């Protein structure tokens, strides 16, 4: 807004105040954000009108704008919370805690827990820090003093706290002056003009010769809806804002708006675009180059003329050949195994059979699909950790970080990679099969959700977006050119594009907002709601004239639409999706050849003609697709890559695509090497991209001494699933040839990192249950003596993240009161009892039992909040309902399951289905089921809405083994796969059908009975402990052993040689670190174990041998392993 328009707002504020429009004046203050009325703010705080206080503040700042703003909102919401507690309105206090204060837990989790603990006190003044809290009135006054200091110090309120000095009734004076001027221009001015309206200019026709007399109009008569004002600037008249921005309207003065952009990025246009000639705009992975010069037609259209142009005209579209449904790529040409779950794919912009693939293990791979050959693989590696932010360094211990997006630059010379934590990588691609490291940028705090290339002013740039709600633009030296703020949720996707000479970016966020940005510092130009109001991606047609978006709502409903750019409205909505998409994630889509739309849903690929909302065709691609497959067309539209459930992808082709692939025949890549090299115009010693410094700087570190080693090719795929049976192979002459796989064996303490928890006076003889806190900062162990012990890691220079780590020994934590979390034992020997424990999601409460009543402990004070369910029968397993911490499933000694409501202290229902005691319970939030396991080797499935039994499955025992002993169950991270653990086996079940997919039986070096096992944080590994002290680490896919940890690696010689020998009784996986786990031992000690920092992970993924690895049985082929459908990009 121009300075004169800003001043006009102040004039209106003065007028509203003088005319006593009290509510309106404060509404305008808030909406404009130009003047913060401290007096009004104080009145509302003193009155305790908290909703109005926050609403008024929202016009000037948001919670996460800066630390001052955060403190302001926190103090207000804390006061609101304390007042509810002081009124003993617990329901209101809980509501404030969950809705208003929860946002601060991400910034200070300990403080949020402490605030939560106030609910447990009869009078919150019992808290030492709040002991001096007086009455409500004095508390508000004290808080207001603090708020005023924060507001005055907050840079966002600078120059907004003082109203400008104005003469009284300044707006009335200006209007009177304008009317006098108009009256002077009257051809026949009347001596006493009658002013009846301000909506039109004044004119009068009095008798001949009358002189104009001054006009004075009382402004009280001025209607609140003002008319047209005289020009406020030398260039454009001030006009009321339109009802809502259109996708075209905000571009009307784009050329003028870009004049403030540095010339290195966007050159300002010297030709302003008339408002009625706004170019409509609203993701194409490849950004086409801009015209080298404006076309003659465009110059004519932009040149000022004597008559207006009603609408924008476009060059005639390029004639497209007729096409039919037979042109859809639906034939399976080949199936290729990537080796880990595929997260992103992109075909080369000019070499249409080169496919770039990104995976969950952080590896990028380039495939020549015509030869079914892997040209190179680059495993995840941080190039220069010292150049990264301390925040990333604290989380960079993971061996790999998943890839969110891979993409080619428009000319195919650069590869962009966006990772799920902080980083982007740029690689220079040198044909045929070499790459060079160009840039590593710590781009965003949290995940980098999307990456794309753009060319403002014909200069290649990289655009990124992330969880930190920002969109950033980088040049090829790693310098940040722009950082766009405005989204209120993590930014999910970006779509850079251009129309004529106007360059812009569309972005979408997880709250379903669509915003548009020019390359300037003026903020977003539009703000729309995407259909579904959740994850949405946007794409332009190949010719750049039509805009589409596809997204999914949180409820699983999917939307594919075409936009009317000029109006900002939806032009057509395509039908054919299921009401609720199968699987957890987001529907993916792509477009090709200006004719075809394709989306992956319901284990198939669906196609639409862009001009018809009815689904045209669909294909299951011979089966094996996930619920929501990812997909990508090549630029010719004759090949389509789609992901499969077994860590691979399929290439679908039409007749033209099949001819292209057959041209390769069975010839190896070497036969085509000369063709690739002849087409490359780059000299190997020259920079691939102009403007990239050949010297290695902070952002463009190059590791020339570490050639990337590709992952071994998986040969376990089912050959029958390939239409063209040609096995993948790697050139014999490659310098980075894959090494033979070897099982990682950790045999001594020098091969891993181990931290032993400090001993305590109440240490038990055994650790029978073990849990990490959900925040990852503590370990909770239940001993055979019925006492729970808690260890916490402190945040310090040695451990900046404050999370559990084997690098630092934590402290045994106890409250100042010295209380101990001692369970009721009901006069029984706790050594003979079946222990059970469960932790609430916010780490505030722990529930446990050890033969006696179930006790609910406060984790901060260790006080017993309540006890319930006295024996007999005794409780044997506990599980919180995932959606309601007040609902608990309790497994019992008598084989029943009690569904207990803590709030009303009542058993809602009893479930009967087992023959012996309950040993395991697991909820699936996605499938809405509870799975129970018992000492009878049975699995039962219960519907959580009706609590009816849906199914009962007997665990298949190895030959000669009796169906007895404890069985544990655990869901993976997306609740679709169930890990079943028994001393005789590890097994993975498809939870929706309760059918066993894989089974592993103890053998060879791991032949002892299994004592316990657990999924890793990301559910990609299984940590299993054995009664001889060995620990096995398995890949979830096929339950293949990738690492064995021998007892000497983590146990002392005394422990190994003791009688009986020491071994792990329980295993717990860290909730955030995928390769960290803890074990509770039979001697009462607890240890945290991690791989060496130089290794970063527990071995590598083993190859499949002859389809089924030794010792692992499967109920399906090696290619029928349905991977978890994670939230897809």
From Swiss-Prot:
Gene3D superfamilies recorded: YVTN repeat-like/Quinoprotein amine dehydrogenase
Renumbered residue ranges of the record's region Disordered: 1092-1129
GO biological process: positive regulation of pattern recognition receptor signaling pathway; regulation of DNA-templated transcription
Compositional bias annotation for Low complexity: 1113-1129
Family matches, as Pfam families: LisH_TPL, TPR1-like_2nd, WD40, zf_topless
Tissues where this protein is expressed: Expressed in panicles, stems, leaves, spikelets and seed endosperm.
GO CC entries: plasma membrane
UniProt xrefs under SUPFAM superfamilies: Quinoprotein alcohol dehydrogenase-like, WD40 repeat-like
Single annotated GO MF: protein sequestering activity
Domain LisH, chain residue ranges per copy: 4-36
Impact reported for residue 150 to A: Loss of interaction with EAR motif-containing full-length proteins
WD repeat copies, ranges: 337-377, 398-437, 443-485, 487-527, 579-618, 623-662, 762-801, 829-867, 870-910, 913-952, 1005-1044
Consequence when changing residue 130 to A: Loss of interaction with EAR motif-containing full-length proteins
Stretches assigned to the CTLH domain: 34-92
Domain notes: The N-terminal TOPLESS domain (TPD)(1-209) binds directly to a 12-amino acid LxLxL EAR motif peptide, but no binding if the leucin residues are replaced.
Record's protein name: Protein TPR1
Taxonomic path: Eukaryota, Viridiplantae, Streptophyta, Embryophyta, Tracheophyta
The encoding gene: TPR1
């Amino acid at each position: 807004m121009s300075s004169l328009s800003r001043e006009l707002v102040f004039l209106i504020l003065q007028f509203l105040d003088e005319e006593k429009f009290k509510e309106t004046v404060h509404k305008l203050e808030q909406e404009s954000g130009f003047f913060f009325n401290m007096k009004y703010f104080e009145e509302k705080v003193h009155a305790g009108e908290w909703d109005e206080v926050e609403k008024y503040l929202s016009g000037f700042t948001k919670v996460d704008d800066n630390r001052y703003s955060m403190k302001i909102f926190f103090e207000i919401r804390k006061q609101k919370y304390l007042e509810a507690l002081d009124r003993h309105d617990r329901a209101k206090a809980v509501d404030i805690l969950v809705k208003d204060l929860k946002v601060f837990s991400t910034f200070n989790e300990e403080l949020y827990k402490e605030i939560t603990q106030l609910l447990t006190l009869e009078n919150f003044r019992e808290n030492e820090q709040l002991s001096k809290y007086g009455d409500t009135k004095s508390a508000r006054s004290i808080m207001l003093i603090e708020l005023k200091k924060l507001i005055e110090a907050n840079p966002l309120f600078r120059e907004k706290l003082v109203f400008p000095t104005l003469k009284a009734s300044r707006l009335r004076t200006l209007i009177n002056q304008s009317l006098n001027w108009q009256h002077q221009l009257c051809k026949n001015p009347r001596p006493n003009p009658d002013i009846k309206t301000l909506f039109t200019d004044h004119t009068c026709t009095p008798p001949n010769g009358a002189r104009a007399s001054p006009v004075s109009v009382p402004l009280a008569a001025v209607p609140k809806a003002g008319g047209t004002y005289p020009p406020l600037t030398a260039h454009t008249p001030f006009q009321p804002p339109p009802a809502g921005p259109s996708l075209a309207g905000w571009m009307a003065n784009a050329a003028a708006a870009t004049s403030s952009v540095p010339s290195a990025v966007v050159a300002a246009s010297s030709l302003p675009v008339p408002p009625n000639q706004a170019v409509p705009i609203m993701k194409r992975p490849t950004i086409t180059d801009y015209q080298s010069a404006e076309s003659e037609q465009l110059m004519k259209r932009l040149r000022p003329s004597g008559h207006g142009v009603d609408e924008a005209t476009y060059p005639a579209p390029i004639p497209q050949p007729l096409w039919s449904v037979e042109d859809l790529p639906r034939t399976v040409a080949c199936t290729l195994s990537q080796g880990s779950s595929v997260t992103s794919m992109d075909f080369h912009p000019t070499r249409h059979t080169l496919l770039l693939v990104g995976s969950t293990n952080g590896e990028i791979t380039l495939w020549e699909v015509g030869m079914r050959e892997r040209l190179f693989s680059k495993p995840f590696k941080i190039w220069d950790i010292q150049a990264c932010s301390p925040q990333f360094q604290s989380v960079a211990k993971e061996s790999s970080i998943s890839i969110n997006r891979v993409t080619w630059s428009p000319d195919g010379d650069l590869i962009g990679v966006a990772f799920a934590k902080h980083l982007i990588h740029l690689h220079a691609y040198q044909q045929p099969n070499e790459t060079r490291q160009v840039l590593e940028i710590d781009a965003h705090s949290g995940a980098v959700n999307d990456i794309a290339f753009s060319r403002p002013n014909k200069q290649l740039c990289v655009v990124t977006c992330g969880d930190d709600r920002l969109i950033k633009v980088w040049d090829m030296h790693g310098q940040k050119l722009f950082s766009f703020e405005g989204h209120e949720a993590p930014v999910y996707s970006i779509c850079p594009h251009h129309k004529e000479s106007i360059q812009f970016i569309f972005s979408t966020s997880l709250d379903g907002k669509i915003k548009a940005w020019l390359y300037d510092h003026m903020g977003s130009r539009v703000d729309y709601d995407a259909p579904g109001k959740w994850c949405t991606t946007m794409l332009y047609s190949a010719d750049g004239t039509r805009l589409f978006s596809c997204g999914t709502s949180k409820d699983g409903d999917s939307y594919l639409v075409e936009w009317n750019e000029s109006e900002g409205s939806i032009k057509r909505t395509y039908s054919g999706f299921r009401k609720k998409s199968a699987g957890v994630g987001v529907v993916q889509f792509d477009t090709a050849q200006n004719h075809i739309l394709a989306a992956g849903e319901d284990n198939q690929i669906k196609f639409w003609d862009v001009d018809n909302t009815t689904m045209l065709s669909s294909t299951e691609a011979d089966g094996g697709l996930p619920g929501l497959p990812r997909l990508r067309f090549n630029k010719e539209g004759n090949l389509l890559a789609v992901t499969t459930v077994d860590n691979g992808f399929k290439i679908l082709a039409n007749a033209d695509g099949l001819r292209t692939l057959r041209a390769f025949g069975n010839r190896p890549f070497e036969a085509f090497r000369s063709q690739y090299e002849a087409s490359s115009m780059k000299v190997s010693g020259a920079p691939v991209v102009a403007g990239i410094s050949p010297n290695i700087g902070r952002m463009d570190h190059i590791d020339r001494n570490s050639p990337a080693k590709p992952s071994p090719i998986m040969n376990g795929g089912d050959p029958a699933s390939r239409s063209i049976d040609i096995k993948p192979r790697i050139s014999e002459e490659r310098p980075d040839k894959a090494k033979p796989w070897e099982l990682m064996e950790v045999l001594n303490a020098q091969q891993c990192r181990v931290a032993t928890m400090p001993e305590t006076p109440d240490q038990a003889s055994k650790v029978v249950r073990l849990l990490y806190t959900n925040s990852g900062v503590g370990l909770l162990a239940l001993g055979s003596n019925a006492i729970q012990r808690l260890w916490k890691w402190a945040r310090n220079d040695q451990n900046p993240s404050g999370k559990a780590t084997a690098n630092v020994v934590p402290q045994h934590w106890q409250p100042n009161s010295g209380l101990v979390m001692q369970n009721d034992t009901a006069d029984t020997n706790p050594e003979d009892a079946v222990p059970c424990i469960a932790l609430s999601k916010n780490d505030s409460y722990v529930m446990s039992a050890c033969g006696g009543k179930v006790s609910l402990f406060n984790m901060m004070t260790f006080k017993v909040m309540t006890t319930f369910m006295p024996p007999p029968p005794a409780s044997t397993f506990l599980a919180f309902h995932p959606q309601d911490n007040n609902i608990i499933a309790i497994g019992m000694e008598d084989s029943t399951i009690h569904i207990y409501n803590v709030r009303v202290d009542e058993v809602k229902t009893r479930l009967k289905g087992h023959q012996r005691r309950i040993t395991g319970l697991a909820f699936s939030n996605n499938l809405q089921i509870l799975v129970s396991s018992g000492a009878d080797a049975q699995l039962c499935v219960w519907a959580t809405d009706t609590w009816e039994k849906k199914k009962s499955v007997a665990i298949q025992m190895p030959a000669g083994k009796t169906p007895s002993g404890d069985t544990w169950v655990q869901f993976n991270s997306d609740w679709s796969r169930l890990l079943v653990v028994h001393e005789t086996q590890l097994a993975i079940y498809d939870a929706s059908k309760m059918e066993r997919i894989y089974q592993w039986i103890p053998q060879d070096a791991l032949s002892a009975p299994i004592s316990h096992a657990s999924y890793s944080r990301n559910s990609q590994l299984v940590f299993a402990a054995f009664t001889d002290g060995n620990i096995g680490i398995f890949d979830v896919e096929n339950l293949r052993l990738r690492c064995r940890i021998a007892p000497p690696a983590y146990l002392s010689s005394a422990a190994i040689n003791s009688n009986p020998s020491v071994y792990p009784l329980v295993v717990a996986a860290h909730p955030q670190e995928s390769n960290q786990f803890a074990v509770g031992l039979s001697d009462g000690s607890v240890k945290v174990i991690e791989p060496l920092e130089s290794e970063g992970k527990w071995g590598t993924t083993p190859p499949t041998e002859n389809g089924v690895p030794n010792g692992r049985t499967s109920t399906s082929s090696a290619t029928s392993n349905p991977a978890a459908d994670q939230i897809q990009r």
